[in-house]
């Protein structure tokens, strides 16, 4: 759940992409260009300031076979994990064949590798479709909307819903957690607080899954993740409630004991001695 990897930050992302383009040019030559469309956390890092890191770069890669070797060489050079840049997300629910169409230009490196990212509404649509409680999906949604509002370019609910339909169709099955956030985020006037509480909830969910993995190795699966999180949250809330009740009962017991103690009603003289 928590990868033992060096994080990819806003500061080093462009450095890695620049080195990747150089390596690709060396292996591939200059005749066949390549295109990489940044998805997910990498797209957030490239375009926004509220998030500091990701652990891998999800992307759509349109390139010759030399790109695979270039990715591995750059990973070795910088001590990055195998697959630090990959297209594995194509196997997830948030993938759509239309993502290339809705991508926007970011940068070109070494005159051969063009980097693109996903336009804001469609990046939000992907995050809503993914809706993982234990990752950054939900807080990324709030963060993106928050930054667009601060910049004077707010994104409407209608534009996000149109983007979801455009990528996934009218009958798209959006996760329950995403639907709940969709209603809350566009009615909230306080994105800062909503971002903080959403991120705290994600970190708690991640912690609960790690705890479950330690207690029940090899039983965590995609289909039971949400129920495990909900069960863990319920137990924690009940534990907090029981702890609070226990403290109140103890306080009440001490107060009652004090009231019943004769010594509590006895006065003292000026030297601090009880009168006889």
Roles of regions detected by a PLM:
Residues 1-276:
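Compositionally biased terminal segments of proteins
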